Amino acid sequence: SAAKYIGTSMKEIIRDSFCLEYEKGVVSIVEIMGRNAGWLTGSTALSQGEDCEGPDLIYLPELPFDLQLFGEKIRQLLQEKTSIVVAVSEGIRTADGTYVCELGNSIDFVDAFGHKQLSGTASYLASYIAGEIGCKTRAIELSTLQRAASHAASRVDILEAYQVGGAAVKAADEGDTGKMVVLKRLSDDPYQCGTEVKDVHKIANDEKLVPRSWVNKEGTYVTNEFISYVRPLIQGDVSPVMVDGIPRHLYTPKELSHR
């Protein structure tokens, strides 16, 4: 569902950029969740279609980020078109391991796993490009909306959530403990997915990274293999219950009184 929202939002951002007219062009940089894995950032490529070319550049955290080459690429693209849209993961790093967002400020807050709180990647890059090239820039951070936009939920996602929940109840009823239900893809075409029960201690704080072969040689875009893998996950729609034009959420009076 997050990928569906991100792909949709990217398409709308690109469409909006058509309305922007500046003498030296405009560069919009969209920051997307992803500390070490670029699945969500790569999903911006889902905006591609007969009515949209998709973002001009996509940068994932799996590959080192070269600030100078980035600037040169933007300068080159501005020779070809007046509006550039770039997708970047919040966790992109330079070759020495420095987060790009750290280039503009220091990060002191860490979570329970010792992870630094990442924010400001798009803002830093927008300022850098504005200073180097002198064009108009926009920094867009999707932030919480990426995981909260339930009005754009994928039906496949919802059905698999039920599938995982059912498998978890079955495993618990059979006496399993300290376990976690995971999804396992069985086929791509037609798309089919099953469940497995795994030891949670072997999964917690682990990550599945985007394969290098699913990113182009220059490290500036995802391949068709990536798109083919992700696209089945965003299929189908779920219509929320609407009240006075706004989606209605499940709630309890007690819950509301403590907020």
Question: What residue spans do the PLM features occupy?
Answer:
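Accessory alpha-helical/coil subdomains and C-terminal extensions
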Residues: 1-138
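C-terminal non-catalytic interaction/assembly regions of soluble proteins
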Residues: 102-259
